[in-house]
């Protein structure tokens, strides 16, 4: 009982900090961080350093616990519960003792970005729809260009391009700009932004 009351957490107990990663890190990320830190403090590279062996063993233990799914779940549960005992003592307890202890466990951190729920077939269908939209835009663009050319020819006949003060010159340019604005279809990204889906 005294051990629990006098317990002080050590930095070596936080395996995520020891490896330099986060509780949301994947196994691949954990292994990559382990390799970097293991190369820095490997006992073979630093034979004169007496703490190199101890540090390497802690890194190895952290990697073993965090790369195993079951032991990582137990470690995360212990870490979030903030129990006043070391992880080794927690592991030594039987499941019945763990069940009889009541405490509030903090939840896991939320992801900053949501994972994609789309399946590969959904992505292919979306890509096909995007291609069809682009083809329609290109067709629409070529027809509008033809219309613009016809309009500009008729405008050239009725108004002098060298005289911008002629009565209908400004009106023609405004109509041209309005037509372009109405012809531009909003992109899918813009639609999602406007509908607060992003």
UniProtKB/Swiss-Prot annotation:
Q: Name one Pfam family in it.
A: DnaJ
Tell me which residues bear N-acetylmethionine.
1
- Give residue ranges for domain J: 14-79
Q: Where in the cell is it found?
A: Cytoplasm
Q: Looking at the record, which segments are called Disordered?
A: 112-167
Top-level lineage group? Eukaryota
Q: Which GO terms describe its cellular component?
A: cytoplasm
* Physiological role: Probable co-chaperone that participates in the proper folding of biopterin-dependent aromatic amino acid hydroxylases, which include phenylalanine-4-hydroxylase (PAH), tyrosine 3-monooxygenase (TH) and peripheral and neuronal tryptophan hydroxylases (TPH1 and TPH2).
Name listed for the protein in its UniProt record: DnaJ homolog subfamily C member 12
What gene codes for this chain?
A: DNAJC12
């Amino acid at each position: 009982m005294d051990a629990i009351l006098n317990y002080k957490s050590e930095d070596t107990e936080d395996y995520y900090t020891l490896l330099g990663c986060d509780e949301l890190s994947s196994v691949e990320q954990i292994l990559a961080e382990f390799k970097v830190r293991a190369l820095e403090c490997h006992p073979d590279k630093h034979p004169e350093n007496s703490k190199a062996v101890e540090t390497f063993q802690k890194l190895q233990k952290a990697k073993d616990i965090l790369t195993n799914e079951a032991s990582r779940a137990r470690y995360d549960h212990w870490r979030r519960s903030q129990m006043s005992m070391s992880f080794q003592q927690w592991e030594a307890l039987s499941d019945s003792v763990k069940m009889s202890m009541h405490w509030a466990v903090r939840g896991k951190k939320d992801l900053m970005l949501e994972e994609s729920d789309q399946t590969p077939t959904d992505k292919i269908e979306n890509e096909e729809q995007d291609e069809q939209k682009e083809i329609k835009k290109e067709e629409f663009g070529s027809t509008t260009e033809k219309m613009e050319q016809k309009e500009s020819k008729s405008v050239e006949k009725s108004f002098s391009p060298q005289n911008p003060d002629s009565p209908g010159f400004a009106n023609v340019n405004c109509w041209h700009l309005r037509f372009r604005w109405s012809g531009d279809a909003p992109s899918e990204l813009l639609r999602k932004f406007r509908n607060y889906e992003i």
